[in-house]
Amino acid sequence: MSNISNDSGLDDSANSGAVVSANGPLAATRLSWFLAEVDDGLMKDGKPNGRRRLCVLHSMELLESDVSDKYMTRFVEFRVNGMVLEAKLILAADERRLVDAALLSMSKEEREDAGGQQLLVQYTENEKAGERLIQKLVSPNNVMLLSTKPELKGNPLVRLAPGCIAHILYAYESRDYMEKILLHLKARSFDLAFDDNLEAEPEAMNDDTWMLVQYSPEPEMVVYQVVQYRQTVWRKENLFKDVIAYMQLPGSDIVLQAVVISYGQDKEVQDAKYEELQRFSFDIDFPLPEELEKHPDHMTSTALFSRTSLYQKAEQRDTTGEHRELRKSLEQMSEKAQGEAQMIIDAFDMVDNINKNLQSRLSGEVRSVVEVTSGDELH
């Protein structure tokens, strides 16, 4: 495993659990993203090794229901692989892309083969839960080049593992640039399939609803899958059912947070979107490095980044007012926490001023004593 969290900044899945209690996950505590630091050994097997690992967390993953401690102590707890871990907050933002940018920047120096060639590949695999479309970055040293298929416009084939054949979508001699290309493809794909439906009365979700979701089970990988709502977990506790879904892959105890791109009662509609995404990656023109430098918006998604956040969209679709009340409550908690923090800062300033005044007074008294003593000696 790398020293970067499974949620590498290239996804919106927030790998590992959401806010959890003895009775299951709780509601979101705050609509914010955090860049945090944890011990790599603790994340792997519960034994600290002193190596730093960076991870992206959402408030919904944190165990504390009171957000005020986050502003004061900078330490939070979250659950992963059945363990409760403590993380040190590095920064927080209401926009995920800001945390992603910080993660990419801080992790650049820690990666190996930063200048080596990277391949962006695409393949499908069949799981018990259904077919998955996977796009990921791989090193050419870890694959075997096979052939080229003319009907796929010359996209070469590579073997990633026995029985796993992938198409090369793009290749370049810069890992940093290729990470941005994966983000670009992800954003464009999201825009293509996203249902931007803000109707007053959206279609209700039930166990028979089919969803096209996007998630990342590991760094530098994006997965698309059509799943039925009944296949997700933590359904009762999920306040944002039409925005996010909690998924547990077969044979794994890890819960992934997936983004719901579109949903409906007709599976064929979602399958058609899935197949469109599968074809779309072969037709897209990827921007060159200099184009990304001149036009950073190439990396962003109109649907995912430029519009209001997905969680705000959930609030807009909130017909009962539940989300709005939650957000109002959280904003009040945030204001209270910030007010308490300012009170503590003011208190420290007051104590500091008192200490300075005392020191100044003591210094003046000492000078007076010295002057009196010196005068007595002269007489």
UniProtKB/Swiss-Prot annotation:
User: What is any one of the record's Gene Ontology cellular component terms?
Assistant: chromatin silencing complex
- Entry annotated with the keyword Nucleus: yes
Arranged from A to Z, the UniProt key words for this protein are: Nucleus
In alphabetical order, the GO MF annotations are: protein-macromolecule adaptor activity
Chief location category: nucleus
State where the protein is found. Nucleus
GO BP = heterochromatin boundary formation
This one is known as Early boundary activity protein 3
Upper taxonomic lineage: Eukaryota, Metazoa, Ecdysozoa, Arthropoda, Hexapoda
Q: Which gene encodes it?
A: Elba3
